[in-house]
Amino acid sequence: MDILCEENTSLSSTTNSLMQLNDDTRLYSNDFNSGEANTSDAFNWTVDSENRTNLSCEGCLSPSCLSLLHLQEKNWSALLTAVVIILTIAGNILVIMAVSLEKKLQNATNYFLMSLAIADMLLGFLVMPVSMLTILYGYRWPLPSKLCAVWIYLDVLFSTASIMHLCAISLDRYVAIQNPIHHSRFNSRTKAFLKIIAVWTISVGISMPIPVFGLQDDSKVFKEGSCLLADDNFVLIGSFVSFFIPLTIMVITYFLTIKSLQKEATLCVSDLGTRAKLASFSFLPQSSLSSEKLFQRSIHREPGSYTGRRTMQSISNEQKACKVLGIVFSLFVVMWCPFFITNIMAVICKESCNEDVIGALLNVFVWIGYLSSAVNPLVYTLFNKTYRSAFSRYIQCQYKENKKPLQLILVNTIPALAYKSSQLQMGQKKNSKQDAKTTDNDCSMVALGKQHSEDASKDNSDGVNEKVSCV
């Protein structure tokens, strides 16, 4: 009897709740259709209906039900991530085009920057859209489970390639400052591409264990329905190998490069001052020197002064390049350090830290790291005139630089002037040779005249002697 009473009581309570729900729904629908309800009533009806929908889905914990709830909300974070994706893809495509088409930018450092732009562009194409999709689905993995390991692999690959490219650029600049002769001799386009291939090979080797183990065991890449690295050992080792060790090398070599440039600039300035003092004491009055000696002195003096000016110019160019690269390095460190530090904290203080807070921080910090891929083209635009002019032309669909009228005049007139000057020099040489021949002929004629006069005087003296003897 007690059981029957309890069942009747539960059935009656359920029936009453359903009747009350139907009455409330009918009341709200009638008020809404008749137009008698005001704005606040309509808003309350909407909120109440959403609450009832949430209550009806409380028992449904499947990913599809939760995904529908999150898709109904306005997600401004997804909109911001879409803007970051567009900027990343468009900006890095411009960098690739600039290095490929502009001859001024075709050197070893810019080849590294082009490869870095390729990594950032692929990150924007293959990784960021999937990450935005997980945001829309409440950080649940909406794709097939086998693609989770592949997505994490691409994410780690392109992020590792970015830091490895910056580390290689820093090492290459340091070697160029310390041993410029060896670097200029072996720093061809082929050598630069071989270094880039080595960077990509290292990046692939570091990130390859993710698909190898993740495809075999889903627990290493899934955690509570979210696609992320769940293996603590790989998180620790990967963070140090792919970020902190290259970061340390990059920072040390960058500061050593700056120190070497400052030292070379000081030595160059002191060397130029010493040469100027020696030159002021060694000059003689122009009247006491012949034109030939003056010409020889100018020939021997010009290369030294030109070399000094060229050395200062090269040091200045290196300092400007280091300034731009320093900004790129700093932005990369500032934007990626929070993610990797939080990633290590999630492993070290796993029991004491709040997992929900750590997870929310990682979701924010990873997009701050992605933002560095979109910032690099903006840095090149602000601090490099060649990149800036190339980007502006490419946006206007002008892929070749239009020569200015002055440049066209110089291109048309300089060869003619050079030809005329060469012809003038050849004419002067011919005239000098002809003058030398005429002087030689004159000298030979004078010598013949002198010999003829001597012979004539000799004949006259012989004739006089004969006459005297006859007498």
From Swiss-Prot:
This is 5-hydroxytryptamine receptor 2A. It is found in: Cell membrane; Cell projection, Dendrite; Cell projection, Axon; Cytoplasmic vesicle. Coiled coil: none annotated. The keyword ATP-binding does not apply. The lineage of its organism: Eukaryota, Metazoa, Chordata, Craniata, Vertebrata. Residues 451-465 have a biased composition (Basic and acidic residues). The gene is HTR2A. Disulfide bonds join 148-227, 349-353. G-protein coupled receptor activity is regulated by lipids: oleamide increases HTR2A-mediated activity. It is a multi-pass membrane protein. Residues 1-80, 138-146, 216-232, 349-356 are extracellular. Keywords: Behavior, Cell membrane, Cell projection, Cytoplasmic vesicle, Disulfide bond, G-protein coupled receptor, Glycoprotein, Membrane, Phosphoprotein, Receptor, Synapse, Transducer, Transmembrane, Transmembrane helix. Its main location: membrane. Glycans are attached at residue 38.
